[in-house]
Amino acid sequence: MTKTDKKSFNQSLAEWKLFIYNRTTGEFLGRTAKSWGLILLFYLVFYGFLAALFSFTMWAMLQTLNDEVPKYRDQIPSPGLMVFPKPVSALDFSFSLSDAESYQGYIDDLKKFLKPYGLEEQKNLTDCTNGTFFEQKGPEYTACQFPLALLEACSGVDDPTFGYQEGKPCILVKMNRIIGLKPQGEPRIECTGKSESTAFLSTYPSNGTIDLKYFPYYGKKLHGNYLQPLVAVQVGFGSDADVREVMVECKIDGSPNLKTQNDRDKFLGRVAFKITMHA
């Protein structure tokens, strides 16, 4: 390295030091303290204004919302259906009659799901009048009792295996909750089976009836102890084949304002599941 190169490097270093802090002008990174102060003040005011504007718009929007009832409910014209226990694969229940472990998971899932429906858990609920809406004005809201006895052979009371041990599996069907829904007519869940082998269905309560006393629903916050009405479907097979299966479709029926036909949603108000039982 030549003497000229060393001088050029020293000059560059001196210029950098001068840029970082100039003792003569008192500048730091090319600006005086006053200049830095004005810039910081500008950004403080600018971003403070943006934060205040965002907070105000959020506050104004929240004033239009109700903590207890959703503002927009017209996008859900009719409830869908769900089934329990939860199948291992999508809506396909498969088990072996000779292997208790293959259906033990279904039994455990049903017991867990029905736990809130026990006598002790329902002792503080209301014994409502059948056939009429249970409308309440608050501020306290209670729920109607749903006796497990309505599910008869699928209640788990007399048969803790819910029919699986005997080859007559039970599936529970329920409607999704919709706040303020008041079904017209006599709503029920109708289930039909389609299979190559002989299979028959038993529905509990009789005819899959859903009593009007379980409506309307007032929302999770107000109606926290609400129990959804259930319909149980028990499948029996008439053949002795090694593999017996049936395709079951359940849909809402008997209520004009609960739809089961929709071009955009082919599963609106209905659900289909398959049961396969191996020997």
Curated annotation (Swiss-Prot):
Pfam name, any one: Na_K-ATPase
Keyword Glycoprotein found: yes
GO cellular component: apical plasma membrane; basolateral plasma membrane; melanosome; sodium:potassium-exchanging ATPase complex; sperm flagellum
Major subcellular site: membrane
Extracellular side: 57-279
Coiled-coil residue windows: none
Localisation: Apical cell membrane; Basolateral cell membrane; Melanosome
Cytoplasmic face residues: 1-35
Gene Ontology BP annotations: intracellular potassium ion homeostasis; intracellular sodium ion homeostasis; membrane repolarization; positive regulation of potassium ion import across plasma membrane; positive regulation of sodium ion export across plasma membrane; potassium ion import across plasma membrane; protein localization to plasma membrane; protein stabilization
Keyword annotations from UniProtKB, A to Z: Cell membrane, Disulfide bond, Glycoprotein, Ion transport, Membrane, Potassium, Potassium transport, Signal-anchor, Sodium, Sodium transport, Sodium/potassium transport, Transmembrane, Transmembrane helix, Transport
TM region(s), chain numbering: 36-56
Signal peptide interval: none
NCBIfam families documented for this protein: Na_K_ATPase_bet (TIGR01107)
Function statement: This is the non-catalytic component of the active enzyme, which catalyzes the hydrolysis of ATP coupled with the exchange of Na(+) and K(+) ions across the plasma membrane. The exact function of the beta-3 subunit is not known.
UniProt record similarity statement: Belongs to the X(+)/potassium ATPases subunit beta family.
Protein name in the entry: Sodium/potassium-transporting ATPase subunit beta-3
Organism: Bos taurus
Taxon lineage: Eukaryota, Metazoa, Chordata, Craniata, Vertebrata
